[in-house]
Design a protein with these regions (language model features):
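Metallo-beta-lactamase
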Residues: 103-151, 158-159
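Metal-dependent phosphodiesterase/nuclease catalytic metal-binding core
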Residues: 5, 30-35, 39, 151-164
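Pre-active-site segment of Zn-dependent metallo-hydrolases
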Residues: 21-26, 33-76, 88-96, 100, ...
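A short catalytic or substrate-binding loop motif that flags glycine-/basic-rich loops and adjacent residues
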Residues: 9, 21-25, 145-150
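C-terminal regulatory/interaction regions
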Residues: 1-6, 23
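Extreme N-terminal starter segment of soluble prokaryotic enzymes
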Residues: 11-14, 37
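Divalent metal-coordination and catalytic microenvironments
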Residues: 15, 31, 41, 78-79, ...
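N-terminal Rossmann-fold NAD(P) dinucleotide-binding loop
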Residues: 83
Length: 164
């Protein structure tokens, strides 16, 4: 029997929180496996009282800029500012397709239009129960309740297993 090396044998799933931990706002998490990265949400935070002159705060996306060629897309769970507010700023640095449900995409479109970016960003509306393929990932949008309509949980199927 021949020893066959599996190209993904040394690969591990990396879950990289870029914002949203130990704070309210800036929700953004990258999931990486091999040569593929997807980004879940892209939110902003509002400045604290001691941040004079600052209008908003966005996540540090240096890792995404450094690995730009791996970023397959942004998958968005819902339309609250802490989940979509940073998109116009981040997409200027890492322009990858955006996937979201209909209402969420409508809110995103409004933000992109305000920033004169509607034509430069690829967007796709995804229905609840529908899956999309991004690099080595398959992402299923699952209907869930939240304080805003059209919210989705995301099931991320990776070569190593499912992240829910």
């Amino acid at each position: 029997m021949k020893n066959v090396k599996n190209d993904t044998a040394d690969c591990k799933v990396k879950i990289i929180p870029l914002g949203g931990l130990e704070q309210i706002g800036m929700n953004m998490t990258a999931i990486e496996y091999g040569d593929s990265i997807i980004v879940m949400d892209c939110g902003l935070a509002f400045p604290s009282d001691d941040m004079l002159g600052i209008d908003l705060v966005i996540p540090d996306v240096t890792y995404l800029k450094d690995n730009y060629e791996k970023v397959k897309g942004f998958v968005i769970t819902h339309g609250h500012e802490d989940h979509i507010g940073a998109l116009p700023y981040v997409l200027k640095m890492v322009n990858a397709p955006v996937y979201a449900t209909k209402l969420t995409m409508g809110l995103i479109d409004h933000k992109l239009e305000e920033n004169n970016m509607l034509r430069s960003v690829k967007r796709k509306v995804v229905k609840h129960g529908q899956s999309i393929n991004l690099g080595c990932f398959r992402v299923e949008f699952i209907k869930m309740n939240h304080s805003i309509e059209d919210a989705a949980a995301l099931a991320v199927f990776t070569p190593a297993g499912i992240i829910l």
